[in-house]
Amino acid sequence: MSPPSPARRSSVLSLPLLLLTLTAAAASEEEFTEELLLRPLPDRKALSHFHFRSATPPPTAASGLHHHIFPKAISQLVQRFHISELELSFTQGRWNYETWGGSDPLSADNAKPPGVELWAVFDLPFADIDATWKNLTHTLSGLFCASINFLESSTAFSAPRWGFKSNEGNLRYGALPREAVCTENLTPWLKLLPCRDKAGIASLLYRPSIYKGYYHSQKLKLTSTQTGGIILDQSLTVVLQPNTSKSKQLHSTGGKLQPSWSMEHLFNRNLLGKCLVSRSSRIFVEIEKGILLKSGSEVSWRNKFFELSTAPDRVLKELDHLEVQSSSLHEYDLSNYNDDKPLDVGIIWKLPLIWSCSPAPYNARRFLMGSGNERGSIALSFLSTDLNKQLPGSSNDCSIKAVVLQLFPWYVKIFYHSLQIVIDGSSKAASEVLDMIHVTPSEDKLSPGTLEMLLRFPCSMQSATLILDFDKGFLHIDEYPPDANQGFDIPSALVSFPDFNSSRKYPEMDPMFVSPLLENFKEDNVVKSYTEVLLVPLTTPDFSMPYNVITFTCTVLALYFGSLLNALRRRIGEEECRLRKAAVKPALIPLLLARLRGHKVDPSESESSPASPVGLKLLVKVALVAIVAVVFHYLSNS
């Protein structure tokens, strides 16, 4: 056989190189970025916001449905259920809007209600949306190891028109306020990352440090278009309490110092480098506007009040929608750090400093009124934060819009005509405050009630209260959840302010600078906030009654039949013979001892034994048990 020609050998050798080139080109179309934002909070806590983005282009004939970085499960989810947008959040704790802020991009987009919240927009005909929603909940339940499948019931989800997000009727929204959040939900969430938690910024997610925080919310958001492909945004927001036992608490001036902290101090983990497949890996330390005003330094990372443990690679100024500097971002690029040069950025406080975060226009609260298990009232209160005074050109005749979305289970029967509005202590007609309202009444055991309202408050208003009366329905015993005596949780109400947005601008940022986190901050997100979960007590049956009846009945029957069968099967003559033998046997030993000693013993005394009335006792016992059984039967029937 002749050896292959040089041209053929070169073609054979170039084939693997060509395959590697095609694979690298396909992988280069998919992108992954990882970012972390750290921020000190006024109440001596620290905020950590992890953000990961995975993007894939639309499938082509060459690439098909194969992925190299993007998670395949998410791609199949989008294609199977025709999803245009989807957002799923798992939250433990409640965001403190008064202290941690309510009008900045981070709180407006990442502060979520307790439990599970899911909404999705489908690219399907209206007739197929509900069935697709039910299948989607089961798929997400298995994917994230949670009870999301409870949202498949028509009594657990709704289709809001404009109170949540403007849509054409293809949006579905549901919430499970009682759903617990644990590591079983975080593990599948991390598996969607190309490096998981083995490398990069995700390696800081140490479970004991994450779940001991005051607030924990993990979110997954999908956006799918025909031209842009699929974009998967994963974010994790945690509020942690730095350990103050090792830090100095009091300053020589008498003030209380903020606790100093670092990444290793917060997460008990070292950051050794970036994820190898990530396009960019950055860490930002945000210094808020309140700190900048008090410290008198705009961009300095070292001043008389605080100092960052590591000099930043870049400093960015943020401008809010009023073109006013709101904060500064100190950037650290992880490509400049490795195992030999690890990064442990933190903040060291030198002087006491008190500041406040930017609040929402109103702090919204919701609570119950009334007493008893038959009826009550739900009150939604608004307390002004005087944010309107900071707006240019505000006058006494101006107004602030507020959109309210509330979901009510079918067993909370709302009387929508009973709406009362009280502003600054005086009652107002609904027509004076309501610009628009949409009500979807609930149907018993079929669908929940939905209330959407567009309110217009005067800028000079300090407080307002909306009151709705309701009746409490009755449930079948099979419809009660575990621990029903605690009460029933009503999902949080959503309050948004269309006149206020939380967008930020970065005029000094390079156009080639790629940061999905800052791109989200640039979007015109409406300022919104969630109220508390409402706990409504309902009349519950005595679930222990069947157990008590069964236990008592079985005990009585066991005593009755046991004694009756014992009396019927036992012979009285055998009992007397057994007693006589028991009395004779102990007397043999004294008789033998007496004969050995030479004493005379009367045999009649040793053989005589007292006759016990055994038969009479048994008859009395059987009669008593029979009387008890008859009395119990009579009382149970009556």
Where are the predicted features?
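Cleavable N-terminal signal peptides of Sec/SRP-targeted secreted and luminal proteins
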Residues: A7-A27, L624-A629
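Transmembrane alpha-helices of multi-pass eukaryotic membrane proteins
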Residues: L13, F543-L559, S612-A626
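N-terminal signal peptide
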Residues: L17-L41, F632-S638
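Extended, low-complexity intrinsically disordered regions enriched in serine/proline/glycine/threonine
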Residues: S28-Y362
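Serine/threonine-enriched low-complexity regions used as flexible
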Residues: L118, F122, F126-N167, L171, ...
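Extracellular adhesion/glycan-binding regions together with long Ser/Thr-
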Residues: P194, S427-D471
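Short beta-strand elements of extracellular/lumenal beta-sandwich folds
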Residues: S371-F408
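Proline-anchored loop/turn motifs at beta-strand termini and strand-loop-strand connectors
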Residues: S399-H417, D424-S426
